Amino acid sequence: MNEIKCISPIDGKVFATRNTLSLKDAKDEIQRLRTAQSAWSARPLSERISLVMAGVEAIGKMNDQIVPELAKMMGRPIRYGGEFGGFQERAQYMSDIAADALKDIEISDDSSFKRYIRRVPHGIVFVIAPWNYPYMTAINTIAPALIAGNVVALKHATQTLLVGLSLIHI
């Protein structure tokens, strides 16, 4: 098993480490996600939206922990560390448009039968998030994927190693 190290640009020291997954562990995690996705997608849209927004709110409550962590991981000055406003706004917007964006699209050119396009969850959405705005860029794909009934496998940049942990702890 290999170790991933986040080296702080502030002092050149290792700030955080995480073990990589073995191939077996990665396959087990994918299977766990497949199982979880069935139950998740069976929840009503309104419930998925509520749970996603509760998670967003929980991240907001962690802001005092998150900002100094980002400063250490990325070297971003603390005064520029607050991403929660944009994070929350993006998630709220996606929640607000979800019902309309996910509704069936009716195609009517013959009154004798009904045709429509129905959006269905894909399953597992793999998100590779960049380091520069690690929360705001991640929520752009995580929120719509979860709201639509998918589950997410998240891989963050090495330089923002702890962001994924913050997101899974909510």
Predicted regions: what they are:
Residues 12, 48, 145-146, 170:
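Hydrophobic alpha-helical segments that mediate membrane insertion or helix-helix packing
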Residues 106-168:
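Conserved small-residue-rich beta-alpha loop and adjacent elements
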Residues 1-113:
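N-terminal Rossmann-like NAD(P)+-binding subdomain of aldehyde/semialdehyde dehydrogenases
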